[in-house]
């Protein structure tokens, strides 16, 4: 009997998926109760990846998506065929750092618990955005509380959510809220999911395990204006969908780019300075739209 179905969505992720799976099986502490499903979103080297995965990890179920419908749509394919009552969503650039699954599954013994998350560590050794505050908060308060929450490992499930790079959720509950919104191609899925889960299950609980850590290679990506526009498109879509005024949040982000750019200038980091200048330009485009 499977207790946990782990879904990993790939898209040209050959550099990451093998090390990701290596860490999954290295720290798998639930044995055959783990089901792993890799869904591929039409990678250019899919066949080579499929052959290697089938050879090295014959127990992994590999599914080729019919098209690249984005992060949410691809994960939904895996969730629908998952056989376990609990589903884990994991990015291919995630690495487990310790035995993880058994402890997180214990949280679901409480029937009110519908999702669990863990502490995200970046390749720099710093903590990632493990905890994010609700979009419904005033933007300044949201930033301040997020800093406090990250420093203190304090998680309030009524006003916060955790990073989507790796989290567990009850499949039945996720199905009832419609799974991932497939209108979101990539980014901003987490706030939308957590808003819908809380609305559907007002008495639910969400567990955060700061003592369980995983590595996320998010800080190793180079800045991409195209990807940043996709991110802001997702953000504004979620704001509008849930009737939240997104403009104050964008204004605060503009001021943050000034602060971070000044810090980069003082460190004589021209590349970082140019990145924040480009981010500010893109944010202004969204404010004018």
Show the residue positions of the predicted features.
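Conserved donor NDP-sugar-binding/catalytic core segment of glycosyltransferases
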Residues: 97-130
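A conserved hydrophobic helix/loop-capping motif in glycosyltransferases and polysaccharide synthases
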Residues: 4-16, 20, 27, 39
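Non-catalytic, C-terminal membrane-associated alpha-helical segments of glycosyltransferases
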Residues: 226-236, 240, 244-289
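Acidic donor-binding segment of Leloir-type glycosyltransferases
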Residues: 21-67
């Amino acid at each position: 009997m499977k207790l946990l179905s782990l879904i990993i969505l790939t898209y040209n992720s050959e550099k990451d998926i093998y090390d990701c799976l290596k860490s999954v099986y290295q720290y798998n502490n639930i044995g055959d109760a783990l089901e792993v499903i890799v869904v591929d979103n039409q990678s250019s080297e899919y066949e080579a990846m499929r052959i290697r995965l089938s050879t090295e990890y014959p127990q992994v179920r590999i599914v080729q998506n019919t098209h690249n419908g984005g992060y949410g749509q691809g994960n939904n394919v895996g969730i629908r065929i998952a056989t376990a009552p609990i589903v884990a969503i994991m990015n291919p650039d995630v690495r487990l750092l310790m035995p993880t699954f058994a402890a997180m599954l214990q949280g679901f013994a409480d029937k009110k618990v519908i999702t669990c998350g863990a502490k995200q560590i970046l390749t720099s050794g710093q903590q990632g955005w493990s905890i994010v505050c609700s979009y419904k908060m005033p933007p300044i308060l949201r930033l301040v509380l997020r800093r406090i929450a990250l420093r203190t490992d304090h998680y309030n499930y009524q006003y916060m959510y955790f990073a989507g790079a790796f989290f567990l959720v009850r499949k039945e509950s996720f199905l009832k809220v419609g799974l991932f919104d497939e209108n979101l191609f990539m980014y901003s899925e987490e706030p939308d999911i957590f808003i819908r889960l809380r609305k559907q299950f007002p008495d639910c609980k969400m567990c955060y395990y700061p003592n369980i850590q995983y590595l996320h290679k998010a800080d190793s990506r180079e800045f991409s204006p195209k990807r940043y526009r996709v991110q802001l498109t997702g953000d504004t879509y979620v704001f509008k969908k849930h009737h939240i005024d997104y403009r104050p949040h964008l204004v605060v982000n503009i001021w943050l780019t000034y602060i971070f750019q000044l810090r980069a200038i003082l460190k004589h980091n021209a590349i970082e300075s140019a990145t924040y200048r480009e981010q500010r330009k893109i944010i202004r485009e969204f404010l004018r739209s």
